[in-house]
Amino acid sequence: MQVAQGALRQGALYDLLDREQPETDLRTATVNALMQRFAVDTAHAERVAATACALFRQAAAPGSERAERKLEWAAKLHEVGCRISHSDYHRHGAYILDNTDAAGFALPELHRLGILVLGQRGKVRKLEADLSDASFALQLICLRLAVALCHARRAPDITEMQLLMEPGTFTLKIPSRWPQAFPQSAHLLQEEMVAWQKTPWELRVQAD
């Protein structure tokens, strides 16, 4: 009996191809299982994920589908730590993702999701070492904006919002009437602008 190396290589190739197809990617099923295991509010998780991904698509370069899917997973798992504590749920969520058995995920992938979950709130400077990666910075700001915009646990209307990305700068364009219509959300956006100060990136909110 001889080992058929060619067949193994072909099989591995098919596994890799399946892994990058949303319909057959085991990681999607794993994320759903983690949501169920830690009693995540599915409706809110999907609301935040949809908002984050919509903003991401506005600013991302063509061919960023993989980064968008990872953002979607991080958004769906952003409250996974609430099962442990509501006060520091972002920290607990990051710990869970760093220490869980998640089929289909490589350890660096899980760590990256954990970093996004950790960075969803609080100071951005704690992740400064990761912010040199423009794709990661975009994922992070989209997640943070989505969490802020969905603070009332309702789907925000972002149809007239536009997120732009330039070297070192993010610009969120909002309708001129929006701050008056949604004062709490406008306040959270102001806080978000402050959070990005003293980092390699600047967030501007522009009312047109």
Segments from the language model and where they lie:
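Long, charged amphipathic helices and adjacent flexible linkers at domain junctions
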Residues: 17-37
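Active-site proximal loops enriched in glycine and acidic residues that flank catalytic Cys/His/Asp
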Residues: 5, 75, 121, 174-176, ...
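Core structural elements
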Residues: 14-19, 75-79, 165-170
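Hydrophobic/aromatic-enriched cytosolic interaction surfaces used to assemble or bind macromolecules
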Residues: 2-23, 181
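Short conserved micro-motifs at the rims of enzyme active sites and ligand-binding pockets
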Residues: 14, 128-129, 183-186
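Low-complexity, glycine/alanine/valine/leucine- and proline-rich hydrophobic stretches
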Residues: 152-206
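Divalent metal-dependent catalytic cores for phosphoryl transfer on phosphate-bearing substrates
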Residues: 32-36, 43-165
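Conserved phosphate-binding/catalytic loops in two-lobed NTP-binding clefts
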Residues: 2-6, 106, 110-111, 205-206
